[in-house]
Design a protein with these regions (language model features):
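Membrane-embedded transmembrane-helix bundle of lipid-linked glycan/lipid transferases
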Residues: 1-149
Length: 149
């Protein structure tokens, strides 16, 4: 059962990483570079450590959701139509909310990076998306604090 979970998550992670690199690259041969980028993403040392040592399933899921967050932010800043901007923004909020529910430190780190990226790219939507995503995960931590005390 454990190996089936790992194989399934790695297939999905490959798909999300390929999609992320496909959104990031603006070259003629972006399919080839997306394939190489996705394989590189799967072979990052910490990713390999998380998968092979089965540190925590939540860490495996975070590695699966981060490319969705990155692709959503890039597509949102590239598109002109408000309908698509809203859809990509909501996808990014949902992805960051999922990451926040899995690991609060990772969500706060990504919130910081999203805010810095928004300042550098002059995209006011980025900090708003980051704050909404972290706020979506906030009730999880409030409930855990109530149960502790």
């Amino acid at each position: 059962m454990e190996s089936t979970f790992i194989i399934l998550t790695q297939i999905i992670t490959f798909g999300t990483a390929w999609s992320m690199f496909h959104c990031l690259l603006k070259r003629k041969k972006k399919d080839w570079f997306s394939l190489v980028g996705a394989l590189g993403y799967l072979l990052l040392p910490y990713h390999v450590y998380v998968v092979t040592e089965s540190v925590d399933r939540s860490q495996i899921l975070i590695w699966m959701v981060v490319p969705i967050l990155a692709a959503s932010l890039v597509k949102m800043s590239d598109t002109e139509k408000m309908f698509w901007k809203t859809g990509y923004g909501l996808t990014a909020v949902l992805a960051l909310g999922i990451i926040g529910r899995l690991d609060g430190v990772a969500a706060l780190t990504l919130l910081f990076l999203i805010c810095v990226g928004g300042i550098c790219r002059r995209q006011w939507q980025y900090p708003v998306i980051g704050i909404l995503g972290v706020a979506m995960a906030y009730p999880t931590y409030m409930l855990s604090l109530i149960h502790i005390s």
